[in-house]
Regions:
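Feature of extramembrane
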Residues: 2-359, 367-377, 511-792, 941-982
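Pore- and gate-forming transmembrane helices of large, multi-pass membrane proteins
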Residues: 346-349, 388, 427, 439-474, ...
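Internal alpha-helical transmembrane segments of multipass membrane proteins
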Residues: 344-389, 393-397, 462-470, 788-825, ...
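Membrane-proximal extracellular juxtamembrane segment immediately upstream
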Residues: 719-723, 730-851, 861-864, 884, ...
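Alpha-helical transmembrane segments of multi-pass inner-membrane proteins
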Residues: 63, 349, 353, 385, ...
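Hydrophobic alpha-helical segments
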Residues: 1-21, 394-508, 904-905, 920
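Hydrophobic, glycine/alanine-rich multi-pass transmembrane helices and their short helix-loop junctions
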Residues: 361, 402-405, 458-506, 512, ...
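Hydrophobic transmembrane alpha-helices and their membrane-interface caps
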Residues: 372-431, 814-863, 946
Length: 982
């Protein structure tokens, strides 16, 4: 009974509640409910329509900032900031694999076209049969001649470790060929046995007597130690004999006497090079991996063979009796790799310095130290966070997007960071300054700031983007990538600024007092307004001098070494190699001529193509190229001159055996040359071929062809295909040139091209592909020629589209033209600045003009926008320029200070670029502050008006005074100097 009572007491109140709910629901008018629900979407839409875009940006301040930071952090690993580098090499935190896809090859600057004789397509023709990926091991011997057996043995050890699978085309070890004094000595030393085998191989092919060939091969294999094998000889006398038979041009390519620390000559060869051809297809390995592995192998051999550690004077610790030998990896491939892998590592080392500099400058300008002499620490820190954090995020996001998209870039893209960092802070400052001027609640002040400043910031961003986009019209892809990256960076900065700055400002509740403009700026502006004609004449004179005189003195010069980080040992040694060996810019003459020789005997062996005649044409062209200043040429002919025909063979009397065998007379003649050293002596293949060529009968021609067949087959495949294509229809003449200025490079290349063209009209005519030198020098010259065209193209686009954009925004073409004049002046001044500093037009400095358009137009826009708002009178001009002067000074100082961090990047080409940019930034600010008011004042005083159309007609008719007075009355508040917060 108790339990039942409890249940009844509980259900009674519940029933009462349910009854009341039913009664209430029954009294609800369903039509009213439906009407209310149907109005909800309309109310939401009306609320959004009533809300300004500025208030929407600040609806959720904390979430907006947090989402922006989260987005930045998600892209951070792709920006390269976590790449391993000096001081940050813990594999737990950093990545050995570069985040950005950087290509340091100069060839990427070449445009792609359909012209078969364009530089890029000619290089592709060479790459069908040969590799253009080359490494050079620079050998320095301080105690011994590099051709002494003990040093040759060390070079041989390095070669055998690096090229452990010879004649494999790089399939197993990624090395196609090795060329050095060691390989030539080994090639010549082992040629005897291969000559004999090649002779009997040709004999078997010509006569069908394969049994005799097999018997002789067994004899040769048994006497390999006596005849010579592919190794460094045991006797120095044999090495010296081989060297004496080598042509001088071949020796100059492989060994040099560069003197000592105190003497010009050492009277011995104390430098050598090992030239290594790398396969184009290296599988999973990158060129960087191969470079690292090769240097590691060299270091290991050095440690185990007591090379010692030569100091700067070439001295070694004699206690351990070292060889005092050093080998350093350099050459085009390591140089390209240094640009590829080291550039961004170096950038991230100096970028924090730039961040600190920009933050410090922001703090100094906004802590009231300059305005009142007192420091408002909290205020300064708030401005640093508000203006600096979005820009820092924008830099990381920009580089992160480049890395995420795997967009191929070049070394020049490292300029994106400092430029975006320096420019980006100004957008945030414009908003915070106007926020500080406004009254009301934080949201009301921000709405007012965005409504008044948002248009100017958007216009600044648009014109800056246009300036940077103009770089994409250059014919060189790397400059296009810089343009896209900078333009994309400004887009990111704009969105980050519009999202983060308003919300950070509200969250931090920034409060800044307003200050009147400094008297210096008021006085400076009064001069061009008062003496507008004199100011215009002065600026015009300086511009004419720069564009007319200084422009002619600025030379175009491409120097790949200056675009590489000079702290890398491979780069330093490349400069030494270039100087001491007069090499470093490898090039090729691709000769299209049939030099094939068959062992066939009889009249059928004499074909229309005369292989020796073509070889003579190659030898003549090689000799003429060697006579050209700053050029060293070698071809297959140098090996023909270095390898002797005669062979020492003991045991079976091979020559007697041949005499007893019925063979055609040409075969017996060749046999006498090879096996009768008493008759042939120590004569080279080339000498014998030349002697046979003097014979007018067909027998001499048959012997010549048979001997050529023997020579080709006596070479190792690796050495033969270094010079000759597998089908014997194409051969290379290797041309080496030192790194020089473009004028000297062009002069040398032009002379070589003349000889290449004349080779088709010589006594022994041969065809050179394109009649031109192919390789690094030709790329340098072609890119240099493209620089000037790309500069004018990008400048024309930048200025043209900037004017169009301003005309659309201001709705007046005349006002747009007048506003752009200071930018044109700044661009014209680049030649005076570059000429004064001895700066050449390079792959980096060529971008200065377009970057200045993007940066400099900002200065003019802020003044022009304020002048237009205030009515375009003389007072409006004075007020606008004076109140904007301090902002220009701040923007210029912060931008220049931020760019100075790039001085810390050890790449020589960047230093003059940064210097010129900083100087021209100052000129851009001065031209906006002085030239622009002079132009406006002149137009107003001349009654020409600042704008066209109906406004100009009113002014020209003398009806302006009432309008001007009305405009001044309507804009009294903006004209008050105290309203500019800076």
């Amino acid at each position: 009974m108790a339990k039942k009572g409890t249940g009844e007491s509980f259900t009674a109140p519940v029933s009462a509640i349910v009854d009341r709910a039913r009664t209430g629901i029954s009294n609800v008018d369903s039509d009213v409910v439906r009407g209310t629900i149907s109005k909800i979407p309309n109310r939401i839409r009306r609320r959004f329509r009533e809300s300004e875009s500025s208030s929407l940006l600040t609806l959720f301040p904390i979430w907006a900032v947090l989402l922006s930071l989260a987005f930045t952090l998600s892209l951070l690993p792709h920006s390269g900031v976590l790449d391993c580098r000096d001081g940050f090499d813990n594999p737990s935190f950093c990545s050995d694999e570069p985040a950005l896809n950087v290509n340091g090859d100069l060839e990427v600057y070449l445009p792609t076209d359909d012209d078969p004789h364009s530089v890029k397509n000619l290089i592709a023709q060479v790459e069908k049969d040969w590799t253009t990926n080359v490494m050079v091991i620079y050998v320095e011997s301080y105690n011994y001649n590099v051709t002494q057996i003990n040093i040759l043995d060390q070079i041989d050890k390095v070669e055998r470790v690096i090229n452990n699978q010879t004649n494999d085309g790089g399939a197993d070890d990624n090395v196609i060929y090795v060329l050095s004094i060691s390989t030539v000595v080994k090639e010549v030393n082992s040629s005897g046995g291969r000559v004999v085998k090649a002779f009997f191989s040709g004999l078997a092919e010509a006569t069908g007597n394969q049994q005799l060939s097999d018997e002789i091969n067994e004899t040769i294999d048994a006497q390999s130690d006596l005849i010579g094998n592919y190794a460094i000889p045991d006797e120095q006398q044999r090495v010296d004999q081989i060297l004496q038979e080598m042509p001088q041009n071949a020796l100059d390519k492989l060994v040099r006497d560069v003197g000592t620390a105190t003497e010009d000559r050492a009277f011995r060869w104390n430098r050598a090079v090992i030239i290594i051809g790398i396969a184009d297809d290296t599988g999973d390995k990158t060129v960087g991996d191969i470079v690292s592995e090769t240097q590691g192998k060299i270091d290991e051999i050095a440690a185990t063979n007591n090379w010692g550690a030569p100091d700067a004077q070439g001295k070694c610790d004699e206690d351990s009796n070292p060889l005092c030998l050093r080998m350093t990896l350099t050459g085009p491939a390591p140089l390209t790799n240094a640009v590829t892998e080291e550039s961004f590592k170096l950038f991230w080392q100096v970028f924090p310095v730039g961040v600190i500099i920009v933050a410090s400058m922001l703090f100094i300008f906004h802590c009231d130290l300059l305005q009142t002499g007192r420091i408002r620490f909290v205020q300064g820190v708030k401005v640093v966070i508000i203006a600096g954090l979005p820009t820092l995020c924008a830099v990381w996001v920009t580089l992160g997007l480049i890395g995420l998209l795997d967009y191929e870039v070049t070394m020049t893209v490292i300029l994106v960071g400092p430029i975006v960092l320096s420019l980006g802070v100004s957008y945030g400052l414009h908003i915070t300054n106007r926020y500080a001027e406004s009254k009301g609640t934080p949201h009301e002040k921000m709405a007012a700031a965005l409504n008044s400043t948002g248009r100017a910031v958007f216009l600044s961003a648009m014109t800056t983007i246009i300036g940077f986009i103009s770089l994409t019209f250059a014919p060189m892809k790397p400059i296009q990538t810089v343009g896209w990256a900078l333009a994309g960076g400004i887009v990111v900065v704009y969105f980050m600024t519009m999202i983060m700055v308003p919300n950070l400002t509200i969250l931090l509740d920034l409060k800044k007092p307003s200050h009147p403009p400094h008297k210096v700026f008021v006085a400076a502006v009064n001069m061009p307004v008062k003496w507008s004609k004199i100011t215009l004449a002065l600026f015009l004179t300086v511009m004419i001098i720069s564009a007319g005189y200084n422009r002619q003195n600025v030379e175009e010069n491409i120097d790949l070494l200056k675009m590489a980080p000079n702290e890398v040992e491979a780069v330093q040694k490349m400069d030494v190699y270039s100087t001491e060996f007069e090499a470093g810019q490898p090039g090729f003459l691709l000769v299209e001529a049939d030099i094939r020789a068959d062992p066939e005997l009889g009249i059928g062996s004499i074909t229309a193509d005369h292989p020796y005649a073509n070889l003579e044409g190659i030898e003549n062209l090689e000799a003429k190229c060697n006579d050209v200043e700053n050029a060293t040429a070698v071809s297959i002919v140098f090996l023909m001159k270095a390898i002797a025909v005669g062979v020492n063979v003991s045991g079976s009397p091979i020559n007697d055996l041949i005499e007893d065998t019925p063979l055609p007379d040409p075969i017996k003649e060749v046999a006498e040359l090879i096996f009768d050293r008493g008759q042939a002596g120590n004569v080279s293949f080339w000498t014998i071929l030349d002697t046979l060529d003097a014979q007018e009968d067909d027998g001499g021609r048959q012997v010549q062809n048979f001997l050529l067949y023997v020579f080709y087959n006596s070479m190792t495949e690796e050495m033969r295909e270094l010079f000759i294509s597998p089908d014997y229809q194409r051969t290379l003449i290797y041309i080496d040139m030192p790194f020089m200025d473009v004028k000297s490079t062009a002069a040398t290349a032009e002379q070589i091209n003349l000889w290449a063209k004349s080779a088709g009209d010589s006594e022994n005519p041969i065809s050179v592909l394109g009649d031109t030198l192919i390789g690094v020098a030709s790329i340098t010259i072609e890119v240099n020629n493209l620089i000037v065209d790309s500069q004018w193209t990008s400048l024309a686009f930048a200025l043209g589209f900037t004017i169009v954009t301003l005309a659309l925004v201001f709705r007046d073409i005349r006002y747009a033209l007048l506003t752009t004049v200071p930018v044109g002046f700044t661009v014209a001044m680049q030649w005076m600045v570059m000429d004064s500093g001895g700066v050449t037009l390079s792959l980096v400095t060529v971008m200065i003009g377009s970057i200045l358009v993007g940066v400099g137009i900002d200065f003019s826009i802020h003044i022009a926008n304020r002048v237009k708002e205030l009515g375009g009178t003389l007072d409006a001009i004075r007020s606008s320029c004076a109140s904007t002067g301090m902002s220009l000074f701040e923007a210029t100082t912060v931008t220049a200070a931020g760019l100075t961090c790039a001085y810390g990047i050890p790449i020589e080409a960047i230093t003059p670029f940064v210097t010129v940019i900083i100087i021209l930034l100052i000129i851009a600010a001065l031209s906006a502050l002085l030239l622009l008011p002079a132009i406006y004042s002149f137009m107003v005083k001349s009654n020409l008006g600042l704008t066209g159309g109906a406004t100009a007609m009113v002014k020209s008719s003398g009806l302006t005074q009432a309008l001007i007075k009305r405009d001044i009355d309507a804009t009294d508040s903006p004209l008050d100097y105290s309203n500019d917060a800076w």
